[in-house]
Amino acid sequence: HFGFVNMNIITLQPDNEHIIQQAAQLLVDAFREHWPDAWATFDEATKEVHEMLERERICRAAIDDAGNLLGIIGGIPQYDGHVWELHPLAVQPNMQGQGIGRALIEDFEAQVRSRGGLTITLGSDDEDNMTSLSNADLFENTWEKIQNIRNLKGHPFEFYQKLGYVITGVVPDANGIGKPDIMMSKRVK
């Protein structure tokens, strides 16, 4: 099920400082190349991880046999728990492509279902000209542009599509002029 990687997926607990520190560093490292403003500093990332640990949220971590963090996923309930926002998902850059992200998402979907959730949504920013939606006028022929989206630089939207997520909209200029957020959703009920 997990490819070549031997791992366990656990609920990250607020007292697990060792993994919390690794998670903060992972957020900085995993987003640095294409989303440098996401968590520019370790302190910002540490604050995000602590927010992920709030009681009503989901926070799951993939850990290898030696106790090292391989990836992390978080979720925020919305619409009275009918919808959950997947935020964030990060996998160690040198471990990507080995099924860790897929396993975290499948686990997250099960967590959402067990809480009565119906739909998962996510936003996947395009801050680095990674898709044909970058620098496009998304106020004109919006759905045609979404329907004809092209992946120019390995943007993760195709990863999510393979797991059953569909593009349900965009937020034009979410990260500055010509830098949209691509909204995706999946029914999990």
Map each language-model feature to its residues.
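Feature marks short, surface-exposed loop/turn motifs that line or immediately flank catalytic pockets
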Residues: 30, 79, 93, 126-130
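Active-site rim helix/loop that mediates acceptor-substrate recognition in acyltransferases
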Residues: 24-61, 74
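Conserved acetyl-CoA binding element of GNAT-fold acetyltransferases
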Residues: 82-93, 121-125
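Conserved beta-strand in the GNAT
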Residues: 61, 67-77, 83-90
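Conserved GNAT acetyl-CoA-binding A-motif
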Residues: 112-152
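C-terminal "cap" of GNAT-fold acetyltransferases
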Residues: 141-189
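Conserved N-terminal entry element of GNAT/NAT acetyltransferase domains
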Residues: 2-21, 186-189
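Conserved acetyl-CoA-binding loop-helix of GNAT-fold acetyltransferases
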Residues: 91, 97-110
